[in-house]
Amino acid sequence: MERGLEDGLLGESGVALVGSELSLEDVLLAAREHYKHLPLCAVQEWIILDAIVTDDERANVIAAGCQPMFLFAHKVLHDEQRRFEPGDWVRSSMGTTFKEGFIFATRNTIYVLVGPGQRKPASIEAIFSIC
């Protein structure tokens, strides 16, 4: 990953948050109680990126059933569908909800946020530059 991303967008200038502090097994069980049908992906060293959008863009995103937010995680701990190996990084599609302080949902995956993380605003261009 480029150093500029590490220093800026993915650096440590956001609002500090704390995800679940349960064991991996326990946090997956807790998430499964709320979400029975979507695959779970547990991550560490995560950042919720709030997309900077206009009011019209926000209205369109919300009308489509989403929120203008994305998740980036430096480290995948466990992915039920094995799309990602432990230790891989991941950037989500647009989020639908962020609940309980550790559950970030998209239309196709429930991301379980473990340990410390952060939340910060970012441009759509910056978010999609993460690849």
Where are the language model's segments positioned?
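N-terminal non-globular leader segments, chiefly Sec-dependent signal peptides
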Residues: M1-F98, P116-C131
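Amphipathic alpha-helical packing elements
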Residues: G101-G115
